[in-house]
C-alpha cells in the first residue's frame, strides 16, 4: 500500500484531505458480500481430474476512503477482522476517519508507519480575552461579577505548556445567561459550539452512550471525535444520574476520554 492516513477530526476537515474520486466502505462491503455469494460449477475432465482453479485477482482500488459514519452500517466481522477484509482488495491509498480501536490497532500493527493526523482546532488567545473583557457586560446582561472569574479561568489556555482542558461550571436559574455565555465564548474564538443535552437520555441509554456499546450504537466518545469545535457545552449536566459522573473524571482532569470502542484526548478544550 502506498499511503495510509488515519485522520481524527470532523467530517468537514476530513473531506479536505481526501481525493475527489474514491470508493467507500459501504461500496466495498457490498462488493465483497456479492462475490462471496457467487457459486462456481467445476466439472472434471475425461480423466476425472478437476482443473486447477485460477488464482482470483484482487479488485484494484486506487483510493479507499472510510468516513466515521460508515462503521454503523457494516457487520461486526468487518470491524473485528478489518485487515482480512482489506486483504481482499488491492488498495493503493487508504484514508480512514475516526476509526474504532479495533480497526486502528489492526492498521497500525500492519502499517506502523501510517500517517496519523489530528484536526487542529482554534485556540484561545490573549486577544480573545481582551475582547471578552470589553464586550461581555454588553452581551450577557446582569452578570458583571462573572466576567472576572471567567477571564481568570480561561487565562491558563493562553499558555503554551497548558494542554489540559479548562472546565467551567455555570449554574443558576434559567435565563441568567449560562448557555449564552458558552455560545459567546465559542463565537469569540470563531468556532461552532459542540452541544450535548444530557436531559434527553434515559439511564439505560446514557450508560451505553457514555461507556460504549455495539459499534453501530451512538457514543459520546465518537461524537467528541467527530466534533467541529473545541468549545464543548454539556447542557443540563445535573440531570444525569450521579452514578455517571465518574465517566467524566479523567476527561475533566486530564482531557482523556475512552470507552470500549474509542480513545481520545482533548487538548486546550473549553468544557
Model-derived regions: residue spans:
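Walker A/P-loop
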Residues: 2-29, 162-196
Amino acid at each position: 500500500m502506498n499511503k495510509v492516513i488515519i485522520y481524527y477530526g470532523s467530517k468537514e476537515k476530513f473531506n479536505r484531505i481526501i481525493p475527489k474520486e474514491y470508493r467507500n466502505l459501504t461500496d466495498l462491503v457490498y462488493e465483497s458480500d456479492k462475490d462471496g455469494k457467487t457459486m462456481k460449477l467445476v466439472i472434471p475432465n475425461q480423466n476425472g481430474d478437476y482443473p486447477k482453479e485460477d488464482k482470483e485477482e484482487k479488485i484494484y482500488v486506487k483510493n479507499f476512503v472510510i468516513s466515521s459514519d460508515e462503521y454503523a452500517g457494516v457487520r461486526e466481522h468487518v470491524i473485528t477482522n478489518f485487515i482480512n477484509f482489506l486483504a481482499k482488495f488491492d488498495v493503493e491509498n487508504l484514508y480512514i476517519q475516526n476509526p474504532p480501536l479495533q480497526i486502528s490497532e489492526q492498521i497500525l500493527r500492519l502499517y506502523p508507519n501510517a500517517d496519523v493526523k489530528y484536526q487542529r482546532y482554534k485556540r484561545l488567545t490573549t486577544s480573545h480575552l481582551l475582547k471578552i473583557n470589553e464586550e461581555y457586560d454588553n452581551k450577557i446582561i446582569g452578570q458583571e461579577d462573572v466576567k472576572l472569574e471567567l477571564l481568570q479561568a480561561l487565562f491558563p489556555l493562553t499558555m503554551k505548556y497548558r494542554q489540559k482542558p479548562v472546565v467551567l461550571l455555570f449554574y443558576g436559574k434559567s435565563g441568567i445567561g449560562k448557555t449564552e455565555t458558552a455560545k459567546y465564548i465559542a463565537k469569540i474564538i470563531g468556532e461552532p459550539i459542540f452541544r450535548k443535552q444530557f436531559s434527553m437520555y434515559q439511564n439505560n441509554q446514557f450508560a451505553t452512550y457514555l461507556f460504549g456499546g455495539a459499534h453501530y450504537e451512538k457514543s459520546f466518545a465518537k461524537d467528541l471525535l467527530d466534533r467541529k469545535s473545541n468549545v464543548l457545552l454539556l447542557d443540563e449536566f445535573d440531570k444525569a444520574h450521579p452514578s455517571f459522573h465518574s465517566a467524566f473524571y479523567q476527561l475533566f482532569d486530564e482531557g482523556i476520554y475512552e470507552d470500549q470502542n474509542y480513545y481520545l484526548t482533548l487538548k486546550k478544550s473549553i468544557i
